[in-house]
From Swiss-Prot:
CDD domains: FN3. It is found in: Cell membrane; Cell projection, Axon; Cell projection, Dendrite; Synapse. The gene is LRFN3. One of its GO terms (biological process) is synaptic membrane adhesion. Its main location: membrane. Pfam families: fn3 (PF00041), I-set (PF07679), LRR_8 (PF13855). Keywords: Cell adhesion, Cell membrane, Cell projection, Disulfide bond, Glycoprotein, Immunoglobulin domain, Leucine-rich repeat, Membrane, Postsynaptic cell membrane, Repeat, Signal, Synapse, Transmembrane, Transmembrane helix. This is Leucine-rich repeat and fibronectin type-III domain-containing protein 3. Residues 249-295 form the LRRCT domain. Cell adhesion molecule that mediates homophilic cell-cell adhesion in a Ca(2+)-independent manner. Promotes neurite outgrowth in hippocampal neurons. Lacks a cytoplasmic PDZ-binding domain, which has been implicated in function of related Lrfn proteins. Glycans are attached at residues 81, 339, 348, 393, 462. The keyword Disulfide bond applies. It comes from Homo sapiens (Human).
Length: 628
């Protein structure tokens, strides 16, 4: 009994003396190797043939390697709660889709490898939560688009960004300009055709920029490139020097690249692709004096143009130079014109006024400028009063003006000018419409020898029922054209125009050949086929008639057979009446005729046809009946 109090005193001390138990770790995924005995915890599954991220991952892991598998997507729950993960490798899988917020819990992640996959775009939410990311490797994908906010969460911490070997034609340069801590930027082997000026000006820590094998023809100067090592510097550039690689681009070696040529180096193999005189030459071997530009020269411009108010007008200006000049337009009031609700400026130098107003008239100035200078040209536009309103079936109009190659008669006037009634002589004998039927008409016009350089003819026509013009382009050697698919019983207004090249301006112009009016013949109303309901009723009636006739014939046959058998059913044979062997009788008294014995029943096969044979002798004068 003395031992019991002692045990009761020692019982509270038992838990304190037992060793502490740790939380049960998650089992290691199949085909993976897990290092859980020492920190940091690692889960290594390279080349394990995985089709998805294993669900039984140890959420305490600091390193997760899933490279060289067949993972097709990364879902939101795949990496949830892995707040201590530092390194994640998903290289060389088949990933096409990354769910928005898939990395949201990886706030401690330092390196993310997604190279060698099949990503086509990177949205704003796919990298959300990576606030400590330093290395982002996205090379060897199929990226064609990168959202402007895709790198917002890691913009201040990112040090290494690799976008090489993708299909990028454009980049969010504003977003890249905010990567203030980036040291290495890989943009090589993409489809970049241009880099905006100042794109790298804020990347003060950038040490390596790779733009090899893109489509760059020029590289604009940037303050960043002042840190490029000069040829006079000894080997071993200083730590602050920038390593720039831009070989494999079709560089256009003109005055725009003189700044780069002055930073001569001896360790790169860039070459010139154009102009032809410098094509194929080593970039650093071309002298600075050969990097020249040509000032712009205006080669074509629109002649003086007159249009009625309310109509559109197109002003054209063409210029050549090296580099290709940019064309701008200045209004008569001195304003620089651009795209607006009333005007559109095209890259080829065309200014289109959608709706002209009386105040738009005056001298428009075309300015062509490039790095070597600028050139100007004046184009006069006259805006007249608006034309009087005309109906689609109007028969009076002003004749087309001659000598104005760029003035195309308005559609309503062109379709009505020089119209020809179908029954009267044509007003314009240049165009004739013959052999017109219900849906076709033959258009003929004479040879236009006074107009040199005709490229083609244009036929435009519309019917009296609508204002929609239909156009047909005809080869220059043709003098006739058969119009088909016309509507019957309608009146058509038609005009033929010659399309030629104006030798004075070098622009394409049109000149009316003539117009005509004709009417198609009304279509004969064909005998319409019976309607489907009618055809169906006829078939039903015919089928019913056949059935009724068949029933009647069947009944008639039964009646005939019934009559032949004497009113007895054909299955029962008629019992023949007793037949006497007496052929005749006399008026004399005769003895009683003996009653013959009843005949034997006939065979069943002969019941239907009974044959009675009478064996009689001739009876007449001198003959007496034969007694029994």
């Amino acid at each position: 009994m003395a031992i019991l109090p002692l045990l009761l005193c020692l019982l509270p001390l038992a838990p304190a003396s037992s060793p502490p138990q740790s939380a049960t770790p998650s089992p290691c995924p199949r085909r993976c190797r897990c290092q859980t005995q020492s920190l940091p915890l690692s889960v290594l599954c390279p080349g394990a043939g995985l089709l998805f991220v294993p669900p039984s991952l140890d959420r305490r892991a600091a390193e997760l390697r899933l490279a060289d598998n067949f993972i097709a997507s990364v879902r939101r729950r795949d990496l949830a709660n892995m707040t201590g993960l530092l390194h994640l490798s998903l290289s060389r899988n088949t990933i096409r889709h990354v769910a928005a917020g898939a990395f949201a819990d990886l706030r401690a992640l330092r390196a993310l490898h997604l190279d060698g996959n099949r990503l086509t775009s990177l949205g704003e939410g796919q990298l959300r939560g990576l606030v400590n990311l330093r290395h982002l490797i996205l090379s060897n994908n199929q990226l064609a688009a990168l959202a402007a906010g895709a790198l917002d969460d890691c913009a201040e911490t990112l040090e290494d960004l690799d976008l090489s070997y993708n299909n990028l034609e454009q980049l969010p340069w504003e977003a890249l300009g905010r990567l203030g801590n980036v040291n290495t930027l890989g943009l090589d082997h993409n489809l970049l055709a241009s880099v905006p000026a100042g794109a790298f000006s804020r990347l003060h820590k950038l040490a390596r920029l790779d733009m090899t094998s893109n489509r760059l023809t020029t590289i604009p100067p940037d303050p960043l490139f002042s840190r490029l090592p000069l040829l006079a510097r000894p080997r071993g550039s200083p730590a602050s020097a920038l390593v720039l690689a831009f070989g494999g681009n079709p560089l256009h070696c003109n005055c725009e690249l003189v700044w780069l040529r002055r930073l001569a180096r001896e360790d790169d193999l860039e070459a010139c692709a154009s102009p032809p005189a410098l094509g194929g030459r080593y970039f650093w071997a071309v002298g600075e004096e050969e990097f020249v530009c040509e000032p712009p020269v205006v080669t074509h411009r629109s002649p003086p143009l007159a249009v009625p108010a309310g109509r559109p007008a197109a002003l054209r200006c063409r210029a050549v130079g090296d580099p290709e000049p940019r064309v701008r337009w200045v209004s008569p009031q001195g304003r620089l014109l651009g795209n607006s609700s009333r005007a559109r400026a095209f890259p080829n130098g065309t200014l289109e006024l959608l709706v002209t107003e009386p105040g738009d008239g005056g001298i428009f100035t075309c300015i062509a400028a490039n790095a070597a200078g600028e050139a100007t040209a004046a184009v006069e536009l006259t805006v007249g009063p608006p034309p009087p309103p005309q109906l689609a079936n109007s028969t009076s109009c002003d004749p087309p003006r001659d000598g104005d190659p760029d003035a195309l008669t308005p559609p309503s006037a062109a379709s009505a000018s020089a119209k020809v009634a179908d029954t009267g002589p044509p007003t314009d004998r240049g165009v004739q419409v013959t052999e017109h039927g219900a849906t076709a008409a033959l258009v003929q016009w004479p040879d236009q020898r006074p107009i040199p350089g005709i490229r083609m003819y244009q036929i435009q026509y519309n019917s009296s029922a609508d204002d929609i013009l239909v156009y047909r382009m005809i080869p220059a050697e043709s003098r006739s054209f058969l119009l088909t698919d016309l509507a019957s019983g309608r009146t058509y207004d038609l005009c033929v125009l010659a399309v030629y090249e104006d030798s004075a301006t070098g622009l394409t112009a049109t000149r009316p050949v003539g117009c005509a009016r004709f009417s198609t013949e009304p279509a004969l109303r064909p005998c319409g086929a019976p309607h489907a309901p009618f055809l169906g009723g006829t078939m039903i009636i015919a089928l019913g008639g056949v059935i009724v006739a068949s029933v009647l014939v069947f009944i008639f046959v039964l009646l005939m057979r019934y009559k032949v058998h004497g009113g007895q059913p054909p299955g029962k044979a008629k019992i023949p009446a007793p037949v006497s062997s007496v052929c005749s009788q006399t008026n004399g008294a005769l003895g009683p005729t003996p009653t013959p014995a009843p005949p034997a029943p006939e065979p069943a096969a002969l019941r239907a046809h009974t044959v009675v044979q009478l064996d009689c002798e001739p009876w007449g004068p001198g003959h007496e009946p034969v007694g029994p």
